[in-house]
């Protein structure tokens, strides 16, 4: 078997499963208020190297995972995430009912055939929840 054939066989058994973005956050309380209370994510884990160390936290909702990090060098402020959803109108209604004082998002119908709900976290990261126009 040649090196190429061996690589081809290995590649056939490899499956890329998912990506988990790391978003930079600067204030734990604000991050919790936005991601947990407002967007409805749950905490999967929290890690600190010691009591006063920066937080690294895994959150999820409906199988979508995001890592939030206070560590310098993790993530870049102003990151954009496009999140495919089913039920963007229902998500809009859910968020509107929470009356988060820093956010009043709306749904936009894009010319490329998507309905999008865009929110910005307190750290400048943009999350675009998107579904195809029916």
Q: What does each model-found stretch correspond to?
A:
Residues 67-69, 128:
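Conserved beta-strand in the GNAT
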Residues 50-55, 75-77, 110-115:
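Short acidic/glycine-enriched loop/turn segments that link adjacent beta-strands
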Residues 59-62, 119-122, 132:
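Active-site beta-strand termini and strand-to-loop segments that position acidic
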Residues 2-32, 79-81, 131-134:
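N-terminal beta-strand motif that seeds the catalytic metal site of vicinal oxygen chelate
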């Amino acid at each position: 078997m040649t090196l190429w054939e061996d690589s081809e066989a290995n590649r056939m058994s490899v499956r890329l499963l998912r990506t988990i973005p790391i978003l930079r956050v600067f204030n734990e309380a604000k991050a919790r208020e936005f991601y947990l209370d407002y967007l409805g994510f749950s905490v999967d884990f929290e890690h600190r190297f010691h009591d006063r160390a920066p937080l690294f936290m895994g959150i999820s909702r409906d199988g979508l995972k995001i890592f939030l990090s206070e560590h310098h060098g993790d993530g870049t402020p102003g990151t954009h995430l496009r999140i495919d959803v089913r039920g963007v109108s229902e998500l809009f209604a859910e968020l509107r009912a929470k009356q988060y004082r820093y956010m009043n998002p709306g749904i936009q119908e894009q010319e490329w055939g998507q309905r999008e709900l865009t929110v910005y976290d307190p750290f400048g990261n943009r999350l675009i929840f998107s579904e195809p126009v029916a």
